[in-house]
Amino acid sequence: MFNLPEPKDDGLLIPEVGEWSKDKHYFLLRYIDAFTNSMKKKKWSGLHYIDLFAGAGIERLKESGKLEWGSPLIAAHCSHFDGLHLCELNNKKFTTLNERVKKICDKAQIFNGDANEKVFDIVKQIPERSLSLAFLDPYGLHLDYETLKVLAQKRADLVIFFPDHLD
């Protein structure tokens, strides 16, 4: 398992999230570890990470005030991925994410716009015979079925977080 350094307040945007986010990222980290370690030696020409609702990259837990890595920076710390393909609709979060990712990883492409539209551009960037892990954590229910179909046609494991409530 790869170790993550503690996130630091870099003066950029840090959205607040509920404490549940800590558990979500704990399980994502374990899935990334299992996925990359089991698939890196297989017949794939590359391993890619897709995050269509990427956020700003660092989050502050509302109750404790503790900083946590967001999903795209968890993946950016994993050296086994040959490419990261990230999308964020919110302009401020996109700009912040772009700055943070570039400090950690030079294999990322970051798209600004609606994930359900940008998914077509994203899958074009992934080479044939590659395997992808797509983490989908939509804000509310902003995930189209067509988006799932596009990703599934590209040899991708889909990890989808559907919140049962929003805070």
Please provide the spans of the model-predicted regions:
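Short, charged/polar micro-motifs that form catalytic or ligand-binding hotspots
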Residues: I14-G18, C87, D137-P138
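SAM cofactor-binding core of SAM-dependent methyltransferases
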Residues: K24-D121
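Class I S-adenosyl-L-methionine
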Residues: V119-L133, Y139-D167
